From Swiss-Prot:
Domain of life per record: Bacteria
Coiled coil: 6-75
Name this protein carries in UniProt: Transcription elongation factor GreA
Keywords: Coiled coil, DNA-binding, Transcription, Transcription regulation
Entries under Pfam families matching the protein: GreA_GreB, GreA_GreB_N
């Protein structure tokens, strides 16, 4: 069976790797210590500290497994340029109705974070912008209507 690739920017890959390393450290030391201390309190059947630590251990182990799976399938997107918008590029766009300018980064769905202006290439905005060049005007359909944007700049 062919492995399904997960495309990530270099920044996205490094972020997931750092989270994995942090969780492994936490699981190995902090949670193990909490479980040990809770065991020392006695009867485990009614020991809420023990149960809470074991539950957290399970959640962390599941996330570690998820991250290891993602990273094993990861392909880092490289070779970006500033001629055409692609995954990983930062894009300066201007709303032609309001004049508002905004810088967003086109990323993979795994890295999307609208609060930090990281927009998935699979989103309505991402689908319209990928492949476009500076100066082009695009129409983006959103729940609140259709918006016209001009692409002012592309950065790596």
């Amino acid at each position: 069976m062919k492995k399904e690739s997960i495309y990530l920017t270099k920044e996205g890959y490094e972020k997931l790797k750092a989270e994995l390393d942090q969780l492994k450290q936490k699981l190995m030391f902090e949670i193990a210590q909490r479980i040990k201390e809770a065991r020392e309190l006695g009867d485990l059947s009614e020991n809420s500290e023990y149960q809470e630590a074991k539950n957290e251990q399970g959640r962390i182990a599941a996330r570690i497994n998820e991250l290891e799976n993602m990273l094993s399938k990861a392909e880092v997107i490289e070779g970006l340029d500033t001629n055409v918008i692609n995954i990983g590029n930062w894009v300066l766009i201007k709303n032609l109705d309001t004049g508002e300018e905004k810088t967003i980064q086109i990323v993979t769905p795994h890295e999307a974070d609208v609060f930090n202006n990281k927009i998935s290439f699979e989103s309505p905005i991402g689908r319209v912008l990928v492949g476009k060049k500076v100066g082009e005007v695009v129409k983006i359909k959103a729940p609140k209507g259709v918006f016209k944007y001009q692409i002012l700049g592309i950065k790596i």
